[in-house]
From Swiss-Prot:
It comes from the Eukaryota. The gene is GDF9. It comes from Homo sapiens (Human). Required for ovarian folliculogenesis. Promotes primordial follicle development. Stimulates granulosa cell proliferation. Promotes cell transition from G0/G1 to S and G2/M phases, through an increase of CCND1 and CCNE1 expression, and RB1 phosphorylation. It regulates STAR expression and cAMP-dependent progesterone release in granulosa and thecal cells. Attenuates the suppressive effects of activin A on STAR expression and progesterone production by increasing the expression of inhibin B. It suppresses FST and FSTL3 production in granulosa-lutein cells. This is Growth/differentiation factor 9. Changing residue 57 to Y: In POF14; uncertain significance. Ovarian physiology and fertility are controlled by endocrine and paracrine signals. These act in a species-dependent manner and determine the ovulation quota in different mammalian species. While humans, and mammals such as the cow or red deer, normally ovulate only one egg per cycle, other mammals such as mouse and pig can ovulate in excess of ten per cycle. The mechanisms that regulate the species-specific differences in the number of follicles that go onto ovulate during each reproductive cycle are poorly understood. Glycans are attached at residues 106, 163, 236, 255, 268, 338. InterPro entries: Cystine-knot_cytokine, Growth_differentiation_fac-9_C, TGF-b_C, TGF-beta-rel, TGFb_CS. It is linked to Altered GDF9 function may be involved in ovarian disorders and contribute to the likelihood of dizygotic twinning. Residues 1-24 form the signal peptide. Changing residue 374 to L: Found at higher frequency in mothers of dizygotic twins than in controls. The lineage of its organism: Eukaryota, Metazoa, Chordata, Craniata, Vertebrata. Expressed in ovarian granulosa cells. Present in oocytes of primary follicles (at protein level).
Length: 454
């Protein structure tokens, strides 16, 4: 029995020694497979490289734009929106944001999100009548699943586009009748709400008038607030020319065609990653900042004076000279004093902590098929060495100086202060959603505007 036991022991040892070798060969083969697949998918979006990051760490590592916009990205192709609706949202983007994507400071509205939905289905109920001025009535179904629970509706409008170019010398009075149809499976609570609304509006068309907006906030606000995401409505128009002002009009008749409307929702995104308009005062009131902040090293993303950097660098150089001259007036130390080392510790480092540009195009990431605007993005980043005596020039707290002393005098394992962003500006983004809707959103903390040492 001794020999079989001894043989079994040797066999187990041999298998244990061989196991790492086979495992290593399998691992190397797996790495080769991954490398080959990476070459085949070299055109894939950079987000795919980050899928293995733990969900708890992802929030701290990824900027809000890449984190939020990549949610819900699937393999199915995106539906393309109506060209007229896309043109309208591009004009809206130019009104709200600069070419670089920064929200304009003269804004007065409270919403930070605008969503445009086109109807999923369109059914004509009855033909129009040119004699009576009745336009063809239609039934529309809007799918609002893209609205999240943190988005609160502030305003909603139906946007009509006039199909053919019309020019009227007189005012055109239109009466719109709109009725919401509730599905059979709806709850009783929603059934009690009024679902039939009649809008009496007077529209005046000019030579270049192409759009009609009908405010339906009072109708949709309770529905969206109750998480109703499927809106089925019936709409018809009756339009006539003003006979009193222009009696020569031929019985008030005209030929006008309205394309099926889009639904625009103006929302306030209350999440932390969204830009909130009341914070815009923080960017407007630069003169009211404290003296310490005014002396800090800063850079502004767009539209600021180019001479600001020159003046700040001049002041930094002058303050550095004053510091060195004041230190030279002090009595000299021991004979072993090294003058060059003494100068070096007070002069600013050559690679000073400051802002750097990093301009990228969304076409480089192959995201330009769904990010409509801006075309380019400059997040900027902070890089450089932090001086030993940071003082208040960077807006750094006293703790930064204490950390420097600990690093130099007590424990070198304690890291030195790092060059990091201190302030940011928001970014406006216009995107095409997977369902073909169009979204304008404003994201907080997307562009670094100031560096500090911490």
């Amino acid at each position: 029995m001794a020999r079989p036991n001894k043989f079994l022991l040797w066999f187990c040892c041999f298998a244990w020694l061989c196991f790492p070798i086979s495992l290593g060969s399998q691992a190397s083969g797996g790495e080769a497979q991954i490398a080959a697949s990476a070459e085949l998918e070299s055109g894939a979006m950079p987000w795919s490289l980050l899928q293995h990051i733990d969900e708890r760490d992802r929030a701290g590592l990824l900027p809000a734009l890449f984190k939020v916009l990549s949610v819900g990205r699937g393999g199915s192709p995106r539906l393309q929106p109506d060209s007229r609706a896309l043109h309208y949202m591009k004009k809206l983007y130019k009104t709200y944001a600069t070419k670089e994507g920064i929200p304009k400071s003269n804004r007065s509205h409270l919403y930070n999100t605008v969503r445009l939905f086109t109807p999923c289905t369109r059914h004509k109920q009855a033909p129009g009548d040119q004699v009576t001025g009745i336009l063809p009535s239609v039934e529309l179904l809007f799918n609002l699943d893209r609205i999240t629970t943190v988005e609160h509706l502030l305003k909603s409008v139906l946007l009509y586009n006039i199909n053919n170019s019309v020019s009227f010398s007189s005012a055109v009075k239109c009466v719109c009748n709109l009725m919401i149809k509730e599905p059979k499976s709806s709850s009783r609570t929603l059934g009690r709400a009024p679902y039939s609304f009649t809008f009496n509006s007077q529209f005046e068309f000019g030579k270049k008038h192409k759009w009609i907006q009908i405010d339906v906030t009072s109708l949709l606000q309770p529905l969206v607030a109750s998480n109703k995401r499927s809106i089925h409505m019936s709409i018809n128009f009756t339009c006539m020319k003003d006979q009193l002002e222009h009696p020569s009009a031929q019985n008030g008749l005209f030929n006008m065609t309205l394309v099926s409307p889009s639904l625009i929702l103006y929302l306030n995104d209350t999440s932390a990653q969204a830009y909130h308009s009341w914070y815009s005062l923080h960017y407007k009131r630069r003169p009211s900042q404290g003296p310490d902040q005014e002396r800090s090293l800063s850079a502004y993303p767009v539209g600021e004076e180019a001479a600001e950097d020159g003046r700040s660098s001049h002041h930094r150089h002058r303050r550095g000279q004053e510091t060195v001259s004041s230190e030279l007036k002090k009595p000299l130390g021991p004979a072993s004093f090294n003058l060059s080392e003494y100068f070096r510790q007070f002069l600013l480092p050559q690679n000073e902590c400051e802002l750097h540009d990093f301009r990228l195009s969304f076409s480089q990431l192959k995201w330009d098929n769904w990010i409509v605007a801006p075309h380019r993005y400059n997040p900027r980043y902070c890089k450089g060495d932090c001086p030993r005596a940071v003082g208040h020039r960077y807006g750094s707290p006293v703790h930064t100086m204490v950390q420097n002393i600990i690093y130099e005098k007590l424990d070198s394992s304690v890291p030195r202060p790092s060059c990091v962003p201190a302030k940011y500006s928001p970014l406006s983004v216009l995107t095409i959603e997977p369902d073909g809707s169009i979204a304008y959103k404003e994201y907080e903390d997307m562009i670094a505007t100031k560096c500090t040492c911490r």
